[in-house]
């Protein structure tokens, strides 16, 4: 879909929010914006950005329908702040199903596949429900196992022969380790591919990062990366080429901007900005996600012509200034994932007495040797030019810290 073909959906969106959104009514009034003057996608630059702070401060003012019409109540994960509520109508839930169905097909899926869901479908988590509905819409099967529980995961794989796993990729090495420890021939299993959610598996040049290499060096499966958020209610999913997540232009208008808010060029890094199309409950205009990605506009070798996003390099709010060096958490994760002895870790970011960032990596107690600490110091220095502090706790305590029951995702990163 070209910008011209997105225009009718954009016009419907502008009319919808101007009539029903208290937040955008106020913004249009304060900025003297005439929505009738915004006739093309290019005209969107006349509108101010919507930020995470706006959503948090005026949450329910974004709602465009009575709450009696809401089918599903969800919240963001609240990684950096309190969770923000999102309200989905029946139409919005169907839009989610359409998105995931098309995303699965982009990742080589079909109605003959059986998906095993290794993430939660409850806890107000939009994506878990979306995956199930997408598989149903496509005509595929799904086994809803949920997060963790390696025994149940393998029992389900052996019993039902799923072909695709949907999981946070850092869980997969644990799954492999469990199989090895329990004499499960995972290489001969029915699994052909893994849809990796929530964490990058590629470097900006599209090569596999250390986590991706760790998985594929042990298990001959195809990895597909995805990028999504509750706010956009849609996903950028890789195709077989593995050259970035494809935009679904029926569901989103994409901008990628620099620090001044101007569009970046082909292949450049910028902040992802989305305008949601076809959303009834809580549509968003020019929403700044805070996520930094490279953008690609050239047609993909798979034949799709929609823009693609590279892996998330970092989040603007998660940028760490440590000993004069700017670091994003994925760079720390990549170093840790390169060390085969490390199967659990947590990165803790804090402020010292002078207000400067400090980084501490928490690791299992059995790794606490002088040789290991020296190896890690050298590795961090060579890869990042700086070395964080290391601290050690029991594996039981670290597992408890990372896999908290009330959390929807592993807490690999903590700010205190």
Each language-model region and where it sits:
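Short hydrophobic/aromatic-rich motifs at helix boundaries and adjacent loops
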Residues: 44-46, 72-74, 102-105, 124-126, ...
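Nucleotide 5′-phosphate-binding alpha/beta core
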Residues: 1-75, 81-98, 102-106, 111-112, ...
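Beta-strand-connecting loops/turns
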Residues: 112-113, 267
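AMP-binding/adenylate-forming
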Residues: 90-103, 114-174
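Hydrophobic alpha-helical segments that mediate membrane insertion or helix-helix packing
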Residues: 76-77, 135
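Active-site glycine/GP-rich loop and adjacent strand/helix microenvironment
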Residues: 1-16, 138-416
């Amino acid at each position: 879909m070209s910008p011209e073909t997105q225009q009718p959906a954009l016009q419907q969106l502008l009319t919808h929010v101007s009539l029903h959104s208290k937040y955008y009514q106020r913004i249009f009034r304060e900025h003297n914006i005439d929505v009738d003057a915004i006739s093309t996608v290019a005209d969107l630059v006349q509108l101010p950005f919507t930020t995470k702070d706006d959503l948090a401060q005026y949450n329910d003012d974004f709602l465009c329908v009575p709450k009696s019409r809401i089918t599903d109540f969800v919240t963001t994960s609240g990684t950096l702040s309190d969770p923000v509520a999102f309200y989905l109508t029946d139409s919005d839930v169907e839009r989610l199903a359409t998105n995931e169905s098309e995303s699965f097909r982009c990742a080589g899926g079909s109605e003959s596949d059986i998906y095993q869901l290794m993430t939660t479908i409850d806890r107000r988590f939009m994506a878990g429900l979306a995956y199930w509905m997408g598989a149903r819409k496509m005509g595929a099967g799904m086994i809803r196992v949920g997060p963790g529980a390696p025994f149940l995961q393998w029992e389900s794989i052996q019993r039902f022969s799923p072909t695709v796993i949907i999981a946070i990729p850092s869980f997969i090495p644990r799954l492999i380790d469990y199989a090895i420890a329990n004499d499960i021939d995972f290489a001969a299993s029915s699994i052909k591919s893994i849809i990796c959610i929530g964490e990058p598996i590629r470097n900006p040049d599209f090569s596999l990062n250390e986590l991706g290499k760790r998985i594929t060096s042990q298990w001959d499966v195809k990895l597909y990366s995805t990028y999504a958020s509750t706010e956009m209610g849609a996903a950028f999913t890789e195709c077989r080429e593995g050259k970035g997540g494809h935009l679904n232009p029926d569901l989103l208008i994409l901008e990628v901007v620099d620090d001044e808010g101007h569009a970046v060029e082909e292949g450049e890094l910028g902040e992802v900005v989305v305008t949601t199309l076809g959303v009834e409950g809580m549509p968003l205009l020019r929403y700044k996600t805070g996520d930094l990605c490279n953008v690609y506009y050239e047609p993909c070798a798979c034949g799709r012509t929609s823009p693609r996003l590279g892996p998330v390099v970092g989040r603007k709010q998660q940028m760490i200034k440590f000993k004069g060096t700017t670091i994003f958490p994925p760079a720390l994760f990549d170093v840790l994932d390169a060390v085969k002895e490390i199967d659990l870790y947590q990165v803790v970011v804090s402020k010292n007495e002078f207000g400067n960032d400090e980084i501490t990596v928490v690791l299992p107690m059995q790794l606490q040797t002088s040789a290991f600490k020296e190896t890690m110091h050298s590795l961090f220095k060579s890869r990042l030019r700086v070395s964080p502090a290391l601290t050690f706790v029991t594996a039981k305590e670290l597992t408890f810290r990372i896999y908290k029951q009330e959390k929807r995702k592993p807490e690999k990163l903590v700010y205190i």
